Amino acid sequence: MSPEATVPEILTYDFMQRALLAAFFVGLAAPMVGVFLVQRRLSLIGDGMGHVALAGVAVGVFTNQAPVLTALVFAVLAAVGIELVRARGRTSGDVALAVMFYGGIALGVVVIGMSGNGTPTNLDSYLFGAIDTTTPGDVRVFAALALVVVALTWALRPRLFAVANDEEYARATGMRVTALNITLAVLTAVTVVVAMRVVGLLLISALMIVPNATAQLVAGSFRSAIRMAVIIGVACSVGGVTTSFYANTPSGGTIVLLAIALFLITASYSAVHDRITGRRHLEAEQHQHEHGPNCGHPAIEHDRHVDYVHDGHRHAPHEGHYDEHDPTKTHDDPVRH
């Protein structure tokens, strides 16, 4: 990897062509799934899935099977299992996630130990990413899986959004909440496996969460937040791979650091912008109906809180009263307090 190489010269390398394609598909899929994980406050589920996938990789190595396939099977089974446990209500989501997290680590360690010192593959490439070792077959598999994730997530986004905001309300309207939660968990598992050779199993959560955190700072609606998160994810993935080529740094860490740097810049700008322009609110008058998760009114994500749709307008709880928001405006439109 010569530092003097120009962009056209980079593209003449077959492994770089494959690396950039893999980065593009991962940057496309990860933020689309991550936006619903952020809404459901499951930002760390990608880490749990990653450790289960590591156990799958170890089993694949031990049995001389394709590690990507065994990792996919393990991650999907874990995703279905955690949602079924959570749906039964006997164990909270965070406890089930912790069990999955530590169980994946333990199984991976045991299987790796059984493989002996002469492990026939470098597990570091799955832990931290090794995009330059991606084969043409890997790219085809990643592309197919990523496109399935993107298509399903986009098609189900209204239902996934409703469940993420108010699960009980979605269930009351007749939505199959458990099936939707399992679908989201499976999509997360597939995304983890797709991304493990690009950013690594230990860093995949960052690519699912950080672009969405950045997009939500500036987006005016949920749909625009998804689009911006995908753009940021693709830009950071492709830009990180390109930067790692020139700087001779690990691709996974470079991608994540680039995403975090963009988040910090955006957060700083947003804080300064809000302080200069001010956020004004209009207090709702004669509002006697209490809003909350079980009030029966649709909940809409709005900046860092939730508005409740009521009588053609939106209300948000604020310090003992309700602010009123124009549903035709974004959260950047000033309204008076």
Question: How should these model regions be labeled?
Answer:
Residues V35-G118, Q216-R227, S244-A247, A271:
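Short loop segments and helix-boundary regions at transmembrane helix junctions
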Residues E4-E9, Y13-D14, R18, L97-L156, ...:
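Transmembrane helix-bundle core of multi-pass membrane transporters
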Residues V26, T135-P211:
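Helix-loop-helix "hairpin" substructures at the membrane interface of multi-pass membrane proteins
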Residues I260-P293:
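Membrane-interfacial segments at transmembrane helix termini in multi-pass membrane proteins
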Residues V198, L202-T249, G253:
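Transmembrane alpha-helical segments in multi-pass inner-membrane proteins
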Residues A19-A22, P67-V73, D94-A98, A143, ...:
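Loop-to-transmembrane alpha-helix initiation sites
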Residues V52-F62, M100-V111, T133, V177-L187, ...:
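Small-residue-rich segments of transmembrane alpha-helices in multi-pass membrane proteins
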Residues H281-H337:
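Histidine-centered metal-binding segments
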